[in-house]
Amino acid sequence: MSIIELLKVIFLGIVEGITEWLPISSTGHMILVEEFIQLNASAAFKEMFFVVVQLGAIMAVVLLYFNKLNPFALSKTKREKRETMRIWYKVVVGIIPAGVMGLLFDDWLNEHLYNYWTVAAMLIVYGVLFIIIENRNKHRYAKINSFSELSYSTAFLIGLFQVLSLIPGTSRSGATIIGAIILGTSRYIAAEYSFFMSIPIMFGASAVKLLKFGFNFTSIEIITLVTGMVVAFVVSIIAIRLLMAYIKNNDFKAFGWYRIFLGVVVIGYFLITNGKVLS
């Protein structure tokens, strides 16, 4: 592997680590970055890489929340272990809608919606939604401030919002956070629940892509995958910590404005470059 290719992989890992957890669409950013940074690999490998690199990001959540999510921790009382198991039950309930829809329509969505128009439109639409919802909630208090207050029905409804994230440019975390806030969840719990729901969803998506691609990797492909995942892991730890510290005293409007700005830039760029936005 050349130094240039290694730097490309490192950069892609950084983008994944930042955008996976901020409500700004990791898939949308990866599509856009690929316009400027092309890996020297087959189309099948690149499609698989952009999904499997998320495993590094997911392991950051597992590490940061290991104690909170571990129902077998010796330091926990029986009551705390039961509470931890309830978190997992609510995660399972929440991922059912997106899991089912993803299995049924993943190929169709990739074929028909994996384009710059869709990405730009979803960036702008959800940017506007973030601003509207945060303005509406400015003087409201959250009804759900802990996982014990999160009901199974609310968890399922948040899962329905996550289905929207199957559309490129939406943002899985963005869709679930918006849904959770609309349903009365605090920003902090909304973000954490979004993180926890991502664990089985992204492990499952990565497993599907790996099975489709096969496990017959070249040495260069192995280095590419491992490097991307390690970088995404390290950057994700930093991004998650910064995001959780930020939302303790701030709302998500800044991310809404960023999404609108980026969506407009995307439309402008691809209109200027020979109408590629129509491809």
UniProtKB/Swiss-Prot annotation:
Transmembrane segments: 3-23, 47-67, 87-107, 113-133, 150-170, 188-208, 220-240, 252-272
Cross-referenced Pfam families: BacA
Enzyme class (EC, first level): hydrolase
Keyword 4Fe-4S found: no
InterPro entries reported in the protein's UniProt record: UppP
GO MF annotation list: undecaprenyl-diphosphatase activity
A single GO cellular-component term on record: plasma membrane
Keyword Membrane carried by entry: yes
EC number: 3.6.1.27
Function: Catalyzes the dephosphorylation of undecaprenyl diphosphate (UPP). Confers resistance to bacitracin.
Protein's UniProt name: Undecaprenyl-diphosphatase
